[in-house]
Amino acid sequence: MRLDSVGKRYGVRQPWVVRGVSADVPAGRLIRVEGRNGSGKSTLLRVVAGITAASEGRVTGRPASAGYVPERFPGGLPFSGREYLRHMARVHGLRGAAGYRQVEGWLERLGAAGYAGQSLGSMSKGMCQKMAIAQALLPSPGLLVLDEAWTGLDTAAREALDEAVAERVADGGAVLFVDHDPARLAGRADERWQVGGDGAVTVLAGPGPVTVPVTVPRIGPRVQRVTVRLETLDAGAVLSRLRAMDGVRVLSADVEHSDSAGGSAGAEVS
C-alpha cells in the first residue's frame, strides 16, 4: 500500500489538515502515528483506512479487507452488541458458521461475551470499545487501523488487543495505531509517522525511545541498583544508551535474540 502526495481538508476554503504525505505501508509492518492533539492524526488514519477520501493525491494498494477502530465509537446504533457484530460479519462476507465462530471468538477473547446481548446504547464506554475492536478484527484484515483503541479497556482486554496486533503483523497484515500512552507497544513499531502542526508527515525508521517505569530499591544514601528487562527491536542500542547516561553504571548486561523481536535486553545498573 502506498500514499502519494496525499492531502486532506474539509472544504475548498478550509485549511489543510494533512498535506503532501508520501509513504509506503508495507505488509507485515507495525507503524505508530505520533503528533500533538489536533495535529491531524485521526484524519490521516481515516484516509489510510479508506473511511474518508483524500482531497488530493492517491492511495493505492489498500488491502481488500481493512479494519478500523475510531477514536469514538457510535454507541447509539439500534442493535445489541451481538446483533451488530453478526451484521458486520455479513458485511465482510462471513456468513453462517464462519461468521458465528468469528463473532463469538472475539467476544470471548475480549471478555465481552456476557454483555453482548445488551443494546449498544446502554453499554459502558469500555464495552462499546470492545465491540468496535471486535468488528475491526472479524475479517482478519490485511490492514488494521487503530485510533486510541486501547482507551477505556480493562487490563485483560488491552492484553488481548496487544496479542491481536502481533497476530495481524505476523500474518502479513499492516497495522497503524495512535495511542496517548508512549509505552503502548513500546519497542515493537517498525516505523513512526510524526504529524506536524503544518500537516506534514515525517516518516522515521525504528521504534523510537522506550520508556520503562521501574521501582528502584534504595540500598545506600547515594547508590540505587535496579534490574531492567525489556523487549526491543535494537537491544544493542538500548544498552549503549544506558551506558552513556550520566550517573549510570552498567554492572552487567545480557542480550537474548528471538524471531519475534530484535532482542531482549537485561541490565543491572547503579
Predicted feature residues:
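A short, flexible loop at the N-terminus of ABC-type nucleotide-binding domains that lies
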Residues: 1-20
